[in-house]
């Protein structure tokens, strides 16, 4: 929003603040000269004058970036971590079904684990709230290397009602993004007072209530804002109560669940003068989920009890920011921010430990993040310079215990060491503009330097319950820590084919630093019951950073009046993907220099694989009323994504095999109608997804004894393709009251999400039960009301 502020007085600053989102949508590809816009508010209870705002050209950027607004989320039925991405090409939320054993252990929580963007998922995609990264999903070291790319506690710490928009950055993150990730970023932006206030409207109150039949959930949300040009604030509260998300299988219904959540946000903006805008924000989120589900024996053929689980998720954040716009000879703007974030995840599970006994497993994950970020901008002739610095200190704890004290054979050690990690970074970028026969051409070089240092803490906690493992032994294995510096260049070429249509070619270097689960994830390290056959899974403090080279060509803008489109073709190459290698003390003595003497076989995290992914995306909207007055209000939306990817390990005899995290081809087509003045409207949207079967490999069971890797005989179930139709509508029944709703999966189609079901088999009764649990909801509906003053 700051790009709209350049060269404006305080009065104009405030006038445009609330309307910046609307201006952005309407003018993203406006002509190169300034455009005069007539804007009026539709939220006031009294007639208001039309404001005329002169907005400068908005910056055009290379790369695949998209935004989902709060209005988009409500229109499309996006009311949780996953459904907000319902129609977004190339982006899907991944997760595990309640009570399922697919990708989770009996004490692991169900739900969303993260996002998949163009075939990379979970911790390789940054997820943040106002630029503060949410915690990584926790690894499942306690199931040895079979747990690769599965997670015990996911990254869902949000309530969509709290956000004014969600920004999505596909591919490796840009140099200006402080949180580096090779898979992209999903950025949740909190609501602000400027979203609701302007000089003619100094108060706002909104109430929203919704019901969703897919999980019988009720939502009630309140947004209140007030203030003037100098001082203004906002308060947002959201309450949700629901049950289990229904599956669509006649033989096996979803396991019972009962959950509720509360979210609060308070933010104050103070503009003491024309040069400073100071914003203080506090936000809080808490969700509790109670559920119970079957517990199966190790063969997967007999249910020997019922597990009961309570999961609690909390997030608390504080931030203070200053936007300084002196417009002097040195800088145009300087934005600085400090922040703190605290998160907690607690899973308490009372579950069978055998056919005749029960235990309680306490699995926790706590983090604290402290950070700062500062960015400056300056225009010098044809040069648009930006630069910034950032730093973050993160502390993680992973308490884990069983009660009563388990036997030697069933004890589970703390899954990873507590850790301390600090990250420092800085970037410089220059957009150099040229006039080529009245067409703007820009060269955009940039570079980010990122440094991360991670060390374990409280190593004595890993020795709990062990008679052979000592703190000094763990310190020898992990105590050295891990650090790395990455130089990440980028280069883009942008050319305006017309004043409203741009093409670009872009290269970006990406980096993904190792996380605590990979560095210090451990299992069986303190065991000695198997003698010289004793094995363990261990992390690796010497891991290298995963890296990527990303190439993209795209076309974005308005090719003709009434048509907006974005298209991209890309190729990404990756190396140093982290996985697990098997070593024996007798066959690989050099790998056991720091390994405790009670362990004779290890599964150790290493930089094992390389991969590539290529694909294409297309999205856009057509307004037919631009050409035919009789169908004013009729529009169509479309989106398409296609990806292919393969990976290869360093094992002898291995070859490139389909990368299972790459999603199948997907298309979205919609037709909508909006009456004059948006008094009512309706839309029908169809989603088509191609079927796909994941390819199994023997990489996770390779003995690493010198023989060539053989092909796997495991046969994953094919996830069938599907077509699904959704119907949505709204009606402005009064000036301040709007009804909205939708019917989703109108034809009650039975289908599965490939990314959450790709490794399922039908070998055992439990496997077949998991397949039934993984079916997505059948026909459901949502109904909501908005009251705004």
Describe the residue ranges of each PLM region.
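C-terminal beta-signal and adjacent terminal beta-strands/loops
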Residues: 135-138, 511, 575, 688-706, ...
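Flexible loop and strand-edge segments within Gram-negative outer membrane beta-barrel domains
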Residues: 255-257, 275-331, 342-366, 402, ...
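Gram-negative outer-membrane beta-barrel transporters
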Residues: 382, 433-438, 443, 450-452, ...
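Transmembrane beta-barrel wall of Gram-negative outer-membrane proteins
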Residues: 211-241, 251-292, 310-325, 433, ...
């Amino acid at each position: 929003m700051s790009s709209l502020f350049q060269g404006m007085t305080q009065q104009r600053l405030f006038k445009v603040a609330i309307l910046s989102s609307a201006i952005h949508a309407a003018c993203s590809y406006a002509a190169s000269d300034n455009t005069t816009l007539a804007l009026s508010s539709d939220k006031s209870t009294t007639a208001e004058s039309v404001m005329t705002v002169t907005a400068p050209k908005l910056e055009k950027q290379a790369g695949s970036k998209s935004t989902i607004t709060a209005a988009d989320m409500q229109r499309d039925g996006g009311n949780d971590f996953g459904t907000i991405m319902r129609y977004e090409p190339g982006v899907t939320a991944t997760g595990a079904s309640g009570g399922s054993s697919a990708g989770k252990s009996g004490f692991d929580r169900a739900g969303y684990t993260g996002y998949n963007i163009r075939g990379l998922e979970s911790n390789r995609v940054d997820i943040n709230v106002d630029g503060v990264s949410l915690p990584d999903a926790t690894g499942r070291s306690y199931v040895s290397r079979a747990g690769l790319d599965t997670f015990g506690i996911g990254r869902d710490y949000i309530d969509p009602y709290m956000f004014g928009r969600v920004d999505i950055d596909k591919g490796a993150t840009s140099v200006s993004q402080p949180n580096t990730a090779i898979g992209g970023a999903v950025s949740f932006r909190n609501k602000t007072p400027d979203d609701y206030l302007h000089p003619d409207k100094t108060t706002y109150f909104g109430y929203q209530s919704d019901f969703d039949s897919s999980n019988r959930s009720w939502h009630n949300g309140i947004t209140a804002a007030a203030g003037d040009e100098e001082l203004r604030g906002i308060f947002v509260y959201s309450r949700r109560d629901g049950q289990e998300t229904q599956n669509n299988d006649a033989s096996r219904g979803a396991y019972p669940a009962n959950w509720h959540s509360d979210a609060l946000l308070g933010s104050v903006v103070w503009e003491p003068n024309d040069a400073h805008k100071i914003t203080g924000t506090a936000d809080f989120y808490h969700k509790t989920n109670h559920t119970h589900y079957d517990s199966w024996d190790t063969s997967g053929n007999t249910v020997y009890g019922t597990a009961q689980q309570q999961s609690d998720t909390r997030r608390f954040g504080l931030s203070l920011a200053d936007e300084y716009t002196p417009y002097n000879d040195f800088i145009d703007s300087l934005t600085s921010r400090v922040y703190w974030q605290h998160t907690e995840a607690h899973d308490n599970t009372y579950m069978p430990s055998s056919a005749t006994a029960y235990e309680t497993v306490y699995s926790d994950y706590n983090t604290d993040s402290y950070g700062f970020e500062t960015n400056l901008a300056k225009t010098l002739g044809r040069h648009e310079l930006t630069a910034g610095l950032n730093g973050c200190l993160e502390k993680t704890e992973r308490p884990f215990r069983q009660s009563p004290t388990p036997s030697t054979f069933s004890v589970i050690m703390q899954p990873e060491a507590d850790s301390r990690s600090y990250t420092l970074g800085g970037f410089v970028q220059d957009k150099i503009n040229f006039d080529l026969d009245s067409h703007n051409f820009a060269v955009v070089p940039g570079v980010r330097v990122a440094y991360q240092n991670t060390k374990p803490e409280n190593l004595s906690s890993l020795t709990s319950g062990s008679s052979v493992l000592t703190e000094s032994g763990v310190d020898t294995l992990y105590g050295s820590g891990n650090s790395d510096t990455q130089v990440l260049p980028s280069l883009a070429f942008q050319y305006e084919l017309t004043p409203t249509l741009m093409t670009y070619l872009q290269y970006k270097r990406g980096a993904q630093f190792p996380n605590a689960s990979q560095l210090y994830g451990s299992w069986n390290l303190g065991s000695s019951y198997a003698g010289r056959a004793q094995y363990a899974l261990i992390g690796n403090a010497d891991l290298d950073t995963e890296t990527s080279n990303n190439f993209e060509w795209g076309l974005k803008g308005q090719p003709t009046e009434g048509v907006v489109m974005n298209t991209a073709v890309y190729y990404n190459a990756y190396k140093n993907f982290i996985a697990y290698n098997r070593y024996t003390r007798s066959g690989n003595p050099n790998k056991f220099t720091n390994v405790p003497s009670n362990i004779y076989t290890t599964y150790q995290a290493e930089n094992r694989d390389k991969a590539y992914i290529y694909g294409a995306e297309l999205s856009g909207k057509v307004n037919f009323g631009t050409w035919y007055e009789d169908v004013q209000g009729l529009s169509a939306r479309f989106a398409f994504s296609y990806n292919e990817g393969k990976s290869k390990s360093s094992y002898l005899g291995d070859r490139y095999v389909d990368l299972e995290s790459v999603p199948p081809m997907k298309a979205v087509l919609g037709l909508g109608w909006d009456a004059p003045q948006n008094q009512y409207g309706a839309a029908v949207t169809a989603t088509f997804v191609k079927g796909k079967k994941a390819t199994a490999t023997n990489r996770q069971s390779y003995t690493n004894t010198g023989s060539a890797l053989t092909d796997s005989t495991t046969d994953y179930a094919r996830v069938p393709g599907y077509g699904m139709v959704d119907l949505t509508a709204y009606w402005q029944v009064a000036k301040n009251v709007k009804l909205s709703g939708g019917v989703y999966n109108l034809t009650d189609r039975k289908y599965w999400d490939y990314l959450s079901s790709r490794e399922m088999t039908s070998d055992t009764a439990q496997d077949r039960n998991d397949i039934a649990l993984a079916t997505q909801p059948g026909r459901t509906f949502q109904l909501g009301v908005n009251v705004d003053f």
